[in-house]
Amino acid sequence: MFASNLDERISRTVWMESKVQAQDMFKYIVNNPGNQTLDGLKSVAINVIGQAGFSQKEDWTPGLRARLGAATTGKAAYFETLSLITQMFLEAALLPTKFMKLPIMSRGLQLLGYHMERTPEYVQEVLNEERNATEKAGGSRSNFLSLLLQLSDEDRRSGQSQFSLSDDEISGSLFIFTTAGYETTANTMGYSVSFLAAYPQWQEWIREELQGLSEDPATWKYEEVFPKCRRTLALMVRSWPPSNSCQCQPFNLYM
């Protein structure tokens, strides 16, 4: 379902936001050397997915928790909720919100409980905001939520309501897109950076490709530059992923 709805407009949004986030991270790391690369990549991942998912713009920060606690309504609060859930997934899945909000709990856990109780309100606000923004723009915007709303509303208008998604189904799809996309993207980038650190010869291989591009990343256009980044893409989308493989083999059962 996701792949069929991710058109070139969303890919372009991912490209543009990734450039901005990566440049901000690079500037910080150059001036503040230390073991913060993996945490920084997590911040890149969640920010890009927030922008591609529902047009939530966030500045890059060295750690995800550095900016939590300020949002109270709408997309900002929903984004903060998703950020907390991705960091404390087991707690979010297993602990009741009343337990999270106890005074003896950590500030992060109390904040998670506060937001999870209000998630239905946030979701409705996000959907209403996106519908209003789409209506003002005169068509769907370049994010995943806008496409889902457009497809669902078109089915309703054409009398095919049995094929349209309810608001709950749309919010569930957005949640999966955000959380699963964050985990996959952050782990893939983190593994790739660790791989490059362990094998410097592949750094040179990637650098040869990048030397053919403009020195100013701000000038990189998606349609022109992305097709040239074949080595970078090969490193990120490899045939041997960081997770363990599970092979299945058919066999006959004899009675």
Question: Where on the chain are the PLM-derived regions?
Answer:
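Cytochrome P450 catalytic-domain helical core, especially the substrate-recognition surface
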Residues: 1-53, 71-128, 215-216
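Short alpha-helical scaffolding segments that buttress acidic/His motifs in well-ordered protein cores
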Residues: 2, 49, 82, 148, ...
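Cytochrome P450 I-helix active-site segment
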Residues: 19, 70-80, 138-143, 197-248, ...
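Short, hydrophobic/aromatic alpha-helical segments in well-folded domains
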Residues: 48, 173, 188-192, 235
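Active-site catalytic microenvironments for nucleophilic, acid-base chemistry
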Residues: 51-56, 192-199
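Short conserved catalytic/interaction loops centered on acidic-Pro-aromatic/His motifs
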Residues: 53-68
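Proline-centered turn/helix-capping motifs that create local helix->coil transitions or kinks
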Residues: 57-58, 87-94, 126-141, 244-248
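Conserved cytochrome P450 catalytic core segment spanning the I/J/K helices
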Residues: 112-188, 251
